[in-house]
Amino acid sequence: MRSVEESYWWYQALRRHVVDSIRPQPETFSVLDAGCGSGGMLAKLRREFPRADLTGIDASEHAIELCRERNTGAQLLRAGVHELPFSAGAFDVVLSLDVWVNAGVDDALAAHETHRVLRPGGKLILNLAAFDFLRGAHDEAVGAVRRYTRPQVRALLEGAGFAVERLTYWNATLTPPIALVRWLSRRQLAQGEARSDFRPLPPFLNAALAGLAALELTASRHLSLPFGTSVFAVARKHG
């Protein structure tokens, strides 16, 4: 997965969404990637914001070891999103990218804990899988047990005390073909096969999909897309 994460168009698009949503910030600010995985997002943040104070946590020790290999200079800790080992108001920005969808995660508790560690006025950047009709073998393969709609995400965040600033679906262009692929994959799942959709693509196809995603990102800066395979939110802690 780490090798795919480096170049795969979807990860590239998500990282662009995140960086675009973090800006503007002062030259020095603090970021927590709560569920940092193998560290692809932390590496991107180090390139984009060289003086940022980066921290990553993950429940997997293997993920933390992979992060260390990237030499991002981030503080790395093994921890879960239910009990973040930081004081209240410790961070300017918290990222949670496709973590709350996972088995064993209480999304409401994670939202409240994220709110606690943000400073007043701090920003949460959140990405979650969208729409139950897009559930397929990919979800089973990556351990995702829930998908969300925009109203559900708004209710979740506002219930934790956040003010929602931006809430949009994304990857709208590819939703119809992905829906078909996921429907077919549910038949495979019935036969006991569960494989992630994220596999290496021919370079020309990967580049074309990255281009489509970049165009959509430009559009989503000015409007909220009505559907997509993921829902993306930016929310602030009052203060």
Write out the residue ranges for each language-model feature:
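A short acidic, Gly/Pro-enriched loop at the edge of an enzyme's catalytic core
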Residues: 82-93
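A short beta-strand submotif of the Rossmann-like class I SAM-dependent methyltransferase core
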Residues: 96-99
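Conserved catalytic loop of SAM-dependent methyltransferase domains
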Residues: 40-41, 166-206, 210, 226-230
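Short, glycine-/aromatic-enriched active-site segment of Class I SAM-dependent methyltransferases
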Residues: 124-146, 152-155
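A short glycine-rich, Lys/Arg-flanked "PGG" loop and its adjoining helix->strand segment in the class I
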Residues: 108-123
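Conserved alpha-helix/loop element of class I SAM-dependent methyltransferases that forms part
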Residues: 10-29, 44
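C-terminal lobe and adjacent flexible extensions of AdoMet/dcAdoMet transferase-like proteins
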Residues: 213-239
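Class I SAM-dependent methyltransferase SAM/SAH-binding core
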Residues: 32, 38-83, 109
